[in-house]
């Protein structure tokens, strides 16, 4: 959980004066709770082309609840992703969560070691007609949270089974609490 909470609350584009390491320490000692819907904290950052970019930071206590949900249900995530990727040749991407060597962060948006990691696009392109590129930097705030459970067990089954006791339902609830209950 430390990688998500202490190093994952603020995106890399924010000035490095912002840190959630002390907030992580506070959460470990106090375990704050937030059972209500919260809003993002907005921050306008200037892009290198002199155009502002709106960056929204989740309410820290709601984000802590989301991190706790992920941490407490990690086995469910592991089992799901194992089933989904078993037998796949390409399992590593530059943005998926993975342990970085000698770092506490869980993920980094652009890995510096592309020489070591390799660039699988060329291998994936062989025999393909198209290469799709996507900027997911603004995906999370606009993501439909129910899509999480739909992706895990299927839309129809998720709609029937709404008891909220499964790990993916808990993740859905915590995700909605971060952005106005949406």
What role is predicted for each listed range?
Residues 1-181:
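Conserved two-metal-ion catalytic palm core of "right-hand" nucleic acid polymerases
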């Amino acid at each position: 959980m430390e990688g998500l909470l202490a190093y994952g609350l603020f995106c890399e584009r924010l000035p490095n004066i912002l840190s959630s390491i002390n907030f992580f320490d506070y959460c470990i000692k106090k375990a704050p709770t937030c059972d209500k819907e919260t809003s993002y904290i907005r921050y306008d950052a200037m892009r290198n082309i002199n155009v502002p970019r709106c960056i929204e930071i989740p309410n820290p206590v709601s984000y802590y609840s989301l991190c706790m949900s992920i941490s407490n249900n990690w086995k469910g995530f592991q089992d799901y992703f194992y089933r989904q990727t078993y037998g796949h040749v390409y399992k590593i991407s530059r943005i998926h969560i993975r342990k970085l060597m000698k770092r506490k962060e869980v993920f980094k948006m652009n890995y510096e070691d592309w020489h070591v990691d390799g660039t699988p696009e060329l291998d994936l392109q062989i025999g393909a007609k198209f290469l799709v590129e996507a900027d997911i930097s603004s995906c999370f705030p606009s993501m439909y949270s129910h899509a999480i459970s739909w992706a895990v067990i299927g839309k129809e089954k998720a709609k029937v089974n709404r008891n909220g006791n499964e790990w993916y339902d808990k993740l859905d609830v915590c995700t909605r609490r971060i952005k106005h209950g949406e």
